[in-house]
C-alpha cells in the first residue's frame, strides 16, 4: 500500500511523490480514497457517502496553520453538499498514522484534505459520488484561488460524526447454534 509507505519510501512512486511535494511545497494537497461502503455515519444506520478529514501532522492532533487551512476547505465542501446528501457525511478518524502520506504531508506544513468516497446505496461503482467529488474539488480550487476559504470556520466540520463500522451486509439474529445456544452473527 503506497499510502502507508511515506516513512520508509520503499517504492519508487513514494520517493517521487515525497520529493516532488518537498520541491513544490504546496499550500494544499488532496488525498482521494474509496472507503468501504459499509462505513456508517456515527454508530447509526446511515451509510457514509462522503467523509472528510483535515489531516493531523502529529499524535496530539495539533491545529497548525496548515491543518486549519485544510479544515476550512473541509468546512467549505461540507456546506456545499450537506443539502444534497443530508445525514450521510462523516469525518474520517483523526488518529495520527506516521506511515501515511496524508499525515506526513501535514507534518511538513502542507494542508492535507482527505476526501473519502463511501457507499451510495446500490451504486457500487460510486458514480454519483464521483460526480459530487468533481464538483467539490472544483469549488475547493476556486475557493483557494480567490481566497474565500479563509472566512470559513471549522465548527460544522468539527461537529461531524465520525466514520464507524455499524453496517453489515447480512445480519442473522437469534440463530440456533446448537439445541441450547442462540446467537446473532
Regions found by a protein language model. Name each.
Residues 1-87:
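Active-site/substrate-binding loop(s) of hydrolase catalytic cores
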Residues 24, 53-185:
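C-terminal accessory segments enriched in acidic
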Amino acid at each position: 500500500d503506497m499510502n502507508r509507505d511515506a516513512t520508509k519510501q520503499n517504492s519508487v512512486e513514494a520517493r517521487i511523490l515525497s520529493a516532488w511535494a518537498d520541491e513544490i511545497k504546496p499550500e494544499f494537497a488532496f488525498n482521494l480514497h474509496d472507503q468501504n461502503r459499509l462505513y456508517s455515519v456515527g454508530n447509526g444506520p446511515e451509510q457514509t457517502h462522503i467523509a472528510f478529514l483535515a489531516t493531523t501532522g502529529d499524535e496530539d492532533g495539533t491545529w497548525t496553520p496548515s491543518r486549519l487551512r485544510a479544515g476550512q476547505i473541509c468546512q467549505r465542501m461540507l456546506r456545499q453538499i450537506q443539502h444534497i446528501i443530508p445525514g450521510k457525511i462523516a469525518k474520517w478518524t483523526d488518529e495520527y498514522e506516521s506511515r501515511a502520506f496524508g499525515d506526513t504531508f501535514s507534518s511538513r506544513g502542507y494542508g492535507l484534505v482527505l476526501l473519502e468516497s463511501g457507499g451510495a446505496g446500490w451504486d457500487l461503482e460510486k458514480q454519483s459520488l464521483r460526480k459530487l467529488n468533481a464538483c467539490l474539488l472544483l469549488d475547493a480550487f476556486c475557493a483557494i484561488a480567490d481566497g474565500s476559504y479563509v472566512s470559513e470556520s471549522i465548527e460544522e466540520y468539527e461537529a461531524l460524526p465520525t466514520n464507524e463500522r455499524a453496517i453489515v451486509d447480512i445480519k442473522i439474529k437469534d440463530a440456533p447454534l446448537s439445541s441450547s445456544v442462540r446467537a446473532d452473527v
